[in-house]
A protein has these predicted regions:
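Short, acidic, small-residue-rich periplasmic hinge/interaction motif at the N-terminus
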Residues: 1-21, 59
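Short, glycine-/polar-rich solvent-exposed loops and beta-turns at beta-strand/coil boundaries
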Residues: 7, 38-48, 106-110, 172-175
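Transmembrane beta-barrel architecture of outer-membrane proteins
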Residues: 23, 27, 49, 91, ...
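Extracytoplasmic beta-strand/coil segments of soluble accessory domains associated
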Residues: 29-70, 86, 92
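Outer-membrane beta-barrel architecture
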Residues: 30, 53, 95, 113-115, ...
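Short acidic/polar hinge/loop motifs at secondary-structure boundaries
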Residues: 70-98, 223-224
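A beta-strand signature from Gram-negative outer-membrane beta-barrel systems
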Residues: 85-130
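Transmembrane beta-barrel wall of Gram-negative outer-membrane proteins
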Residues: 126, 133-164, 168-210, 216-220, ...
Length: 234
């Protein structure tokens, strides 16, 4: 993690409260679109198919780490945000380091490095339920409990969520659940912090960007209000 006026690299830090304020029914990457050097879009796809570019470089040339662990695909360097749909509710801070990095990870960080933290010690104590609704049948329910740091330096965080939406056109429907558990320990007077996190995001979603082929219209398209098969047509 870069430090201001210490690490010689251009970076921007976004707190979890800022992300929570911007979230609404947006995906995680879309909450970062106002960060300098960052461009995001949904690639005409379904839920979780968003893309993020840092200084013009896509997934394959940008390193993504969550709690210090690389999450880019080991074969092609891509990252599938549909596997991290609950990240927007768990993030305590995000740091975007722009430009060529010196990371020793397998992914070449020509565009930069995006570091996401979900540390339990950085979350304010509290318990609550959040509900959100949007257009096209989107709704989301989230329940959470954060203990904060106690006198012994221990902290924990729990979260359970559910979301569903139809999307703004055919082929964008999706549904999923999110669960997370995190335990942290910060020794008194120490310079280190220990954190254990368990994150899951079971989901399914349609992928509209594959499109519909001409043959699909010939085989299944409506003809005078009826479905017809091209093989039966003269």
């Amino acid at each position: 993690v870069a430090r201001e006026r210490v690490t010689p690299i251009a970076f921007s830090s976004v707190s979890g409260s800022e992300i929570d304020l911007k979230a609404g029914n947006l995906e995680f990457v879309e909450t970062l679109k106002r960060t300098p050097g960052v461009y995001t879009n949904q690639d005409n796809g379904g839920y979780g198919d968003g893309q993020m570019y840092v200084r013009g470089f896509g997934f394959t040339n940008t390193a993504y780490v969550i709690n210090g662990q690389p999450v880019n695909d080991m074969e092609n360097g891509r990252i599938y945000w549909s596997n991290w749909m609950g990240l927007i509710d768990l993030t305590s801070s995000v740091q975007i380091q722009r430009g060529l990095g010196s990371t020793s990870l397998a992914v070449p960080s020509a565009g930069g490095t995006v570091s996401v933290n979900t540390r339990a010690a950085e979350v304010d104590p509290g318990t609550g339920i959040k509900m959100a609704a949007g257009d096209n049948g989107y709704h989301k329910f989230t329940a959470f409990h954060n203990t904060g740091v106690n006198d012994l330096g221990w902290s924990s965080s729990f979260l359970l969520g559910f979301w569903r939406g139809d999307g703004w056109r055919n082929g964008m429907k999706g549904e999923g659940t999110t669960y997370a558990f995190s335990v942290g320990y910060t020794p008194r007077g120490g310079d280190h912090e220990f954190n254990f996190s368990l994150i899951g995001a079971g989901q399914w979603h349609h992928q509209a960007y594959y499109g519909t082929q001409l043959q699909d219209y010939l085989d299944y398209g409506p003809i005078q209000g009826k479905r017809a098969c091209a093989s039966k047509r003269q």
